Regions:
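N-terminal first-folded block
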Residues: 43-46, 52-55, 90
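Inter-motif core of Ras-like GTPase G domains
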Residues: 73-97, 107-112
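Conserved C-terminal guanine-recognition region of P-loop GTPase G domains, centered on the G4
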Residues: 93-143
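Canonical P-loop GTPase G-domain recognition
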Residues: 124-181
Length: 181
């Protein structure tokens, strides 16, 4: 799963790596969303995911990785339960200008005992914090990876997914990592 707050780059992340044209369920943002959906520094954002994004990567003939992106607005969180069922893990995308938007996302995956990693998608006009500052702000254990990722760049997204798969293996091999610290 690829998750995070509203407008952090989840759709872009999936689009950068998917070997198929990603399935996106975007709708135009309207005046009704003013005050509910805050695009922050992304004032140019005109569409939003309303159900899910879907992409696919074939790792080899017998292993295909399916990517499901969650909608970022709180009013669509009820859809997440269907998406998390059977998920190996989650990439939680963070925008440093709105770190607080990822707290409910962290809680969700911790409550569902889903291994996850944190990736900071750097926006040009967002405040810069080093990864240790992000870890501290989120109250994360040392064994949870916090990485930089450019959601537009295929290699950056690929490295992120490798880190997620490593975290999934760690989670399965060491039960203590299943406990929230």
């Amino acid at each position: 799963m690829v998750s995070g707050g509203f407008g952090v780059g989840k759709t872009t992340f999936i689009g950068a790596i998917s070997e198929i044209e990603p399935l996106v369920t975007e709708a135009s943002m309207t005046e009704v969303s003013i005050g509910i959906d805050d695009p922050g520094h992304r004032a140019d954002k005109t569409a939003t995911t309303v159900a899910l994004d879907f992409g696919r990567i074939t790792l080899d003939d017998s292993l295909i990785l399916y990517l499901f992106g969650t909608p970022g607005q709180d009013r669509f969180v009820f859809l997440w339960d269907d998406l998390v069922d059977g998920a190996l893990g989650a990439v939680i995308v963070v925008d440093t200008s709105r770190v607080e938007d990822c707290y409910p996302v962290l809680d969700y995956f911790e409550d569902h005992n889903t291994p996850f990693i944190i990736v900071v998608n750097r926006f040009d006009d967002a405040p810069h914090f080093d990864l240790d500052e992000v870890r501290e702000a989120l109250g994360l254990a040392d064994w949870i990876p916090v990485l930089d990722c450019d959601a537009r760049d295929r290699d950056s997204v690929k490295n992120t997914l490798v880190a997620l798969l490593e975290q999934v293996l760690l989670h399965r091999a060491h039960p203590r990592h299943r406990e929230v610290s």
